[in-house]
């Protein structure tokens, strides 16, 4: 690309403070207004050069800087805090301090808000300091090291050892990596072109080569590599050309122009512009490497998901096509499939046109019961708005819907309001019934305790036997009523709960066919016949207690228990008994019972189980008394029993049909531990002809050969104890040895895993007397064995029978001899309770021990992990300390080696200089001795001795006394020769031509400096630099006597002493550069020096509004 290069400003005329201020203000305005078209006109050209080349700041820019609006808006965008937009300088300074950036100016002074607000005079240093702080915050925000490494990793490989340490190092790392990639591409086509790398970001940026190569990598068409000037020894013109390429590219090919410099700002780069360079490179990085937004990752679904063989995706325009088809087709012309029935039923599901996105796309077959159940559940809880809308379409037609008048919405709202009202009524009824249930439960408890109190006062044997036998019969009735729920859902739920006990239902059985129910009305009539018969002892007993309970009768009549509460104990699972046939106690009720049994063969709703006494008390189902009749005779019909069933052998009744002596049926947890007097044993009746069992009788399981093993399941025993309100009763009898009752025998109960681990015995055995001695119980208590007792046991009892035979073979038999105590004993299962308590205690101890062991183990593991972590950290710290010590030791050794080399170099150079002087003195003179070299110490000794021995002559100056006469100390005679000081004028002249002022652009400055040096008669010249980067500031001469440098040209102090100098340089004419020398004293080997920062005077730019500036 060929374009004319404008004239550059001479280096002595360039003012870095003006360039810094202009670049900083431009960056601040561009940060606030990212697009140039949004920038106000007064701020767009707020900083310009006048005709004389001086910068001028517009009053609008000064006002915006002093009121803090520009700073606040820039800080709001950098820190992403919108609240800062309306704040002032104080808020910006506070947020910068919180961010860890101190705003300092003039050394180490903090910038105050008053300095920024003041406009006359305009405090330029304070404003530059806050702009630099904002640049630093912007750099930290957009140039994190990880982001730069990630961006470079997308182009080339990055080694872990190459990762930068800070943001500035990251920018240098990014530029060098891209330059290496460009070099690889260019070398394939042209091997003569050499793409350089940047060793120092600020020194190597002036030639513009690396930045142009960077632009070529990202925009090869806008910045061709052939247009870039690559030259190892680049001249000032080459640097200016590359920088103008960079400026034009940023102005025309980038969305936001980040180049806010003048060409001289980068060509004569000063330290004050380093932060501006950082901000410029950061903006380039953001535009070339924008942040990558990660694509959203779909979170995997947790839990069961519907099985889909094809992905479910919406069919485009599916609903629109259906709507168009419906609108275009008239009702009378529609096919039958489009004509919905006029009467919409609740059981009809939603239309197929309604979106079913929540359902599976692959329909599968379902059982009819599930479909019916789901339909019945949905019809009361789902409002089908589609069917409502279709109903209105049929009535008013499609045309009315097109002319929408709000009737459809009003109808939908009315339907919803009606549904909400019904729901509120149901919730109110449920709340009221729940409250009534609690109240009735408390009253039922009170009635029960009152009845128990009266029962405990009566100790006669007949009453107890009467209660006992009546309770046994009601237990059998309870078993039938417990299965009287009737509905499929309730029955299936109970069957599932019963099937969870292995002793009740065995695997492989089809148990629903074996279950039968008892009509509830017949049971209620039989129960009522116990109480209302005029000849029962119960009526006689109740008449005696009538007077004592008259006051409580009115109150107790309102304390009836609800049927739902009375069924709580019935709904706790299947009771493990064989099937029973309930007998009618009185022949007068036989015909009525027979009619009820024939009418109610199907499923009947559950009725309350229990009866009411004449006093008004309610007798629960498990505590109702049975009246005992001794002489009542009734002749049954031939071949028929008292319950209307075919007559079979009834071991519990005599020929007259009267009930035998009182018996007790073990239902939940009452042991069969009763005896009957021998004089009350009924005579053995001849066996009658066995008839087929009644198919309407209740069967819990399929038939079994052995019906003597009757046992309840353990969970049901515990539940029955809990429903007895904690009340047990017992009649004393002589002590006897009773083996422990076996609670269960299949050893398949569920235990805690801690018990299985810590307990030696996996299953506790508790022996039951009724299980170990079934034949004895059948012989002693024939009235307890009901009809078909042996035909209704589950086949899974074979295992229990085998265990019972084993127990009988070991001699665990109960004493069947009668005792003197009449009646029977009601045991509260103390032995079983103690065993269960013992087992529970052992479980608690085992759980506690396991918990403690687990806690200790966990604690030990944590301590072990902590120790391992501390050990690893200690080892890592030790390795790091060793590395630091090794690096420090290497550094010290390196410094010592360098110092040793420097001292050796100085010694050799001094000897060489002294030898040259001696050879010059002895030129042209013959002598017998060869020339020898004296050291500096010998020369000083000779000088001192000559001063002491030789007296001062008149007219001789003190300066002449300082000249050493080495010949006086010589053993031979030599001629006197005055020492000639060596001059570095030629070296300084070479440095000015090739190092300090290279190129044609600096001819005028170079010639003027050389002319001033030629006019001086001094022998040794020194060049003043700004810092270690060897930026020219002035030319000085060295006074050897006073060790003072005196200025003859350029900038800087008039005189400089050694105390003012911080570094000294020596010029290498071959390499054409200056080298820093580690010394603090001036000597003949020094060619340049730099002074401390506090001795530099900063030029003040006059305010644009001051009269002095206007005069210029």
UniProtKB/Swiss-Prot annotation:
Under CDD domains, the record lists:
CH_SF
Q: Which stretches of sequence are listed as region Disordered?
A: 324-358, 485-504, 542-566, 788-834, 916-965
Instruction: Enumerate the spans annotated as CKK domain.
Output: 972-1109
State its location(s): Cell projection, Axon; Cell projection, Dendrite; Cell membrane, Sarcolemma; Cytoplasm, Cytosol
The question of whether Signal is a record keyword is answered with no
Feature: compositional bias, Polar residues: 345-358, 489-504, 935-951
Please give the GO cellular component terms listed in this UniProt entry: axon; cytosol; dendrite; microtubule minus-end; perikaryon; sarcolemma
- Pfam families, alphabetized: CAMSAP_CH, CAMSAP_CKK
Q: Which residues form the Calponin-homology (CH) domain?
A: 165-286
State where composition is biased (Low complexity). 542-557, 956-965
Phenotypic consequence of gene deletion: Viable with no gross morphological defects, but exhibit uncoordinated locomotion and body positioning. Small reduction in the density of microtubule bundles along the length of the body. Fewer microtubules in the axons of PLM and ALM neurons. Defective touch neuron morphology with ectopic neurites extending from the cell bodies of ALM neurons.
The record ties this protein, via SUPFAM superfamilies, to:
Calponin-homology domain, CH-domain, PRC-barrel domain
Q: Name one GO molecular function term.
A: microtubule minus-end binding
Q: Which residues form a coiled coil?
A: 850-914
> Which cysteine residues pair off into disulfide bonds?
none
Name the tissues where it is expressed.
Expressed in larval and adult epidermis, intestine and pharynx. Broadly expressed in the nervous system. Expressed in body wall muscle cells.
- Domain of life of the source: Eukaryota
Please state which protein family the record places this protein in.
Answer: Belongs to the CAMSAP1 family.
Q: What is known of its domains?
A: The CKK domain binds microtubules. Might be required for microtubule stabilization. The Calponin-homology (CH) domain might negatively regulate the CKK domain.
> What is the recorded function of this protein according to its Swiss-Prot or TrEMBL entry?
Required for microtubule stability and anchorage by binding to the minus ends of microtubules. Acts redundantly with noca-1 to control circumferential microtubule assembly along the body which is necessary for larval development, viability, morphology and integrity of the epidermis. Promotes microtubule stability and polymerization in neurons. Involved in the maintenance of neurite morphology in ALM and PLM neurons. May play a role in synaptic protein localization in the PLM neuron. May act upstream of dlk-1 in neuronal regeneration.
Q: Subunit composition?
A: Interacts with dapk-1.
Q: What is this protein called?
A: Patronin (microtubule-binding protein) homolog
Q: Look up and give the organism this protein is from.
A: Caenorhabditis elegans
Gene symbol?
ptrn-1
């Amino acid at each position: 690309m060929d374009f004319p290069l404008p004239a550059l400003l001479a280096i002595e005329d360039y003012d870095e403070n003006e360039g810094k201020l202009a670049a900083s203000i431009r960056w601040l305005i561009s940060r606030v207004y990212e697009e140039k078209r949004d920038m106000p006109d007064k701020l767009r050209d707020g900083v310009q050069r006048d005709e004389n080349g001086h910068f001028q700041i517009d009053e609008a820019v000064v006002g915006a800087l002093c009121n803090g609006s520009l700073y606040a808006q820039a800080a709001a965008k950098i820190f992403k805090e919108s609240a800062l937009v309306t704040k002032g300088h104080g808020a910006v300074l506070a947020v910068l301090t919180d961010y860890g950036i101190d705003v300092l100016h003039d050394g180490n002074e903090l910038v105050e808000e008053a300095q920024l607000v003041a406009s006359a005079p305009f405090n330029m240093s304070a404003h530059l300091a806050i702009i630099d702080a904002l640049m630093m915050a912007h750099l930290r925000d957009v140039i994190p090291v990880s982001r730069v490494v990630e961006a470079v990793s997308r182009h080339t490989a990055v080694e872990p050892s190459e990762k930068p340490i800070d943001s500035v190092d990251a920018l240098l790392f990014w530029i060098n990596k891209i330059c290496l990639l460009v070099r690889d591409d260019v070398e394939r086509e042209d091997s003569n072109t050499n793409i350089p790398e940047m060793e120092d970001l600020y020194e190597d940026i002036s030639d513009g080569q690396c930045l142009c190569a960077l632009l070529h990598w990202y925009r090869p068409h806008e910045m061709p590599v052939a247009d870039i000037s690559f030259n190892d020894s680049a001249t000032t013109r080459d640097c200016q050309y590359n920088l103008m390429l960079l400026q034009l590219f940023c102005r025309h090919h980038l969305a936001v122009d980040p180049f806010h410099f003048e060409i001289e700002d980068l060509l004569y780069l000063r330290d004050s512009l380093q932060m501006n360079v950082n901000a410029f490179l950061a903006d380039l990085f953001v535009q070339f490497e924008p942040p990558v937004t990660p694509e959203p990752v779909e979170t995997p679904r947790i839990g069961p998901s519907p099985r889909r063989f094809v992905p479910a995706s919406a069919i485009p325009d599916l609903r629109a096509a259906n709507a168009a088809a419906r609108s275009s087709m008239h009702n009378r012309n529609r096919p039958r499939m489009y004509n919905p029935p006029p009467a919409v039923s609740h059981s009809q599901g939603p239309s197929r046109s309604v979106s079913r996105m929540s359902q599976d796309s692959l329909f599968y077959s379902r059982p009819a019961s599930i479909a019916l159940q789901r339909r019945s559940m949905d019809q009361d809880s789902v409002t089908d708005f589609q069917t409502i809308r279709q109903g209105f379409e049929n009535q008013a037609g499609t045309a009315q819907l097109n002319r929408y008048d709000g009737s459809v919405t009003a109808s939908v709202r009315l339907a919803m309001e009606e549904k909400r009202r019904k729901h509120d009524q149901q919730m109110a009824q449920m709340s009221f019934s729940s409250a009534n249930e609690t109240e009735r439960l408390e009253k039922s408890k009170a009635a029960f305790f009152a009845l128990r109190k009266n029962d405990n006062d009566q100790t006669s044997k007949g009453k107890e036997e009467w209660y006992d036998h009546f309770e046994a019969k009601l237990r059998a009735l309870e078993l039938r009523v417990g299965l009287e729920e009737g509905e499929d859902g309730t029955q299936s739920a109970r069957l599932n709960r019963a099937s969870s006990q292995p002793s009740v239902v065995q695997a492989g059985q089809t148990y629903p066919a074996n279950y039968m129910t008892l009509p509830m009305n017949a049971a209620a009539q039989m129960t009522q016949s116990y109480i209302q018969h005029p000849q029962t002892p119960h009526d006689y007993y109740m008449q005696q207690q009538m007077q004592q309970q008259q006051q409580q009768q009115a109150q107790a009549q309102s304390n009836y228990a609800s049927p739902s509460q009375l069924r709580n104990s019935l709904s706790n699972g299947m009771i493990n008994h064989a099937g029973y046939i309930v007998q009618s106690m009185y022949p007068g009720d036989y015909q009525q019972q027979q009619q009820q049994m024939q009418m109610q063969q199907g499923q009947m709703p559950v009725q309350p189980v229990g009866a009411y006494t004449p006093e008004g008390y309610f007798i629960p189902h498990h505590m109702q008394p049975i009246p005992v009749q001794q002489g009542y005779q009734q002749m049954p019909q031939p071949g028929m029993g008292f319950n209307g069933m075919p007559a079979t052998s009834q071991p519990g009744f005599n020929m007259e049909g009267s009930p035998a002596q009182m018996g007790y049926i073990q239902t939940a947890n009452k042991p069969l531990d009763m005896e009957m007097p021998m004089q009350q044993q009924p005579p053995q009746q001849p066996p009658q002809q066995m008839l087929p069992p009644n198919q309407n009788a209740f069967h819990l399981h399929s038939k079994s050969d052995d019906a003597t093993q009757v046992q309840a399941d353990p969970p049901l025993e515990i539940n029955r104890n809990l429903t007895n309100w904690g009340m047990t009763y017992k009649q004393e009898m002589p002590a006897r040895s009773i083996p422990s009752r076996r609670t269960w025998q299949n050893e398949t109960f569920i235990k805690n895993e801690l018990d299985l681990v810590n307990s030696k015995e996996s299953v506790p055995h508790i022996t039951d007397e009724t299980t170990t001695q079934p034949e004895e119980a059948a012989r002693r208590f024939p009235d307890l064995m009901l009809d078909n007792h042996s035909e209704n046991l589950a086949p899974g009892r074979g295992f229990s029978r085998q265990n019972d035979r084993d127990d009988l073979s070991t001699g665990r038999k109960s004493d069947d001899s009668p005792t003197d105590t009449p009646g029977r004993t009601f045991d509260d299962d103390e032995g079983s309770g103690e065993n269960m308590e013992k087992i529970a205690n052992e479980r608690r101890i085992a759980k506690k021990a396991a918990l403690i062991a687990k806690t200790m183990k966990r604690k030990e593991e944590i301590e072990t992990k902590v120790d391992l972590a501390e050990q690893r950290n200690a080892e890592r710290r030790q390795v790091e300390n060793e590395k630091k010590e090794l690096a420090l030791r290497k550094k010290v050794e390196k410094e010592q080696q360098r110092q040793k080399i420097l001292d050796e170099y100085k010694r050799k150079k001094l000897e060489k200089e002294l030898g040259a002087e001696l050879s010059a003195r002895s030129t042209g003179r013959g002598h017998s001795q060869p020339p020898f070299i004296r050291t500096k110490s010998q020369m000083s000794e000779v000088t001192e001795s000559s001063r002491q021995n030789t007296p001062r002559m008149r007219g001789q100056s003190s300066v002449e006394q300082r000249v050493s006469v080495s010949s006086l100390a010589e053993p031979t005679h030599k001629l006197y020769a005055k020492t000639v000081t060596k001059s570095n004028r030629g070296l300084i002249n070479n440095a000015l031509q090739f190092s300090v002022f290279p190129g044609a652009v600096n001819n005028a400055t170079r010639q003027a400096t050389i002319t001033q040096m030629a006019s001086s008669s001094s022998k040794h010249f020194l060049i003043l630099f700004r810092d270690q980067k060897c930026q020219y500031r002035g030319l000085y001469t060295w006074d050897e006597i006073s060790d003072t440098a005196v200025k003859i040209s350029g900038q800087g102090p008039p005189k400089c002493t050694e105390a003012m100098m911080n570094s000294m340089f020596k010029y290498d004419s071959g390499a054409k550069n200056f080298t820093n020398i580690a010394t603090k004293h001036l000597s003949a080997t020094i060619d340049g020096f730099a002074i401390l920062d506090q001795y530099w005077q900063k030029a003040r730019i006059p305010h644009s509004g001051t009269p002095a500036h206007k005069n210029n």
